[in-house]
Amino acid sequence: MSLTFYWYPKCGTCRKAKKWLEEHGKEINEIHIAEQPPSKEELKALYEKSGLDLKKFFNTSGMKYRELNLKEKLYHMSEDEQLELLASDGMLIKRPLTTDGEKVTVGFKEDQFEENWA
C-alpha cells in the first residue's frame, strides 16, 4: 500500500515523519505541499475521511497564518471558504498530510503514525 505524503522538504517535522515511514518500510508518493497543494476537492475528501475539525488542517504556527490573522478570521468563515483558502496556498496546510485513500493523518505524532501506518 502506497501512502500519499504531502510535505515541505525544509520542514524538520516532515523530515522526521518521512524517516519514520521509511524505517517502517512504507512506500510513499511524495508531493511538495507548497508546489502542488491538494485541490479544494481533495482537501474536502481528506477532511471528511479524517474525522478531524477542519481547523486542524491549518498550519497555525506558520507565518502566512499569522500574516492573514486567521486565528480571528476562521471563526467567521464557512467550511467552503476555509477549504478554498487552504487550497490556495500549501503553506497554510498543517504538514505533513498523509493518506492511504481511507485514513488521514495531519502533522506528525509518532503514536498516531504507529496507530495508522505501522
Curated annotation (Swiss-Prot):
**Which one of the record's GO molecular function terms can you name?**
oxidoreductase activity
Q: Does the keyword Repressor apply?
A: no
**Which cysteine residues pair off into disulfide bonds?**
11-14
Task: Supply the alphabetized keyword list.
Answer: Disulfide bond, Oxidoreductase, Redox-active center
Family the entry assigns: Belongs to the ArsC family.
The cross-references to PANTHER family, in alphabetical order and at most eight, read:
ARSENATE REDUCTASE (PTHR30041), PROTEIN YFFB (PTHR30041:SF8)
- What is this protein's record name? Uncharacterized protein YusI
The record lists the organism as Bacillus subtilis (strain 168)
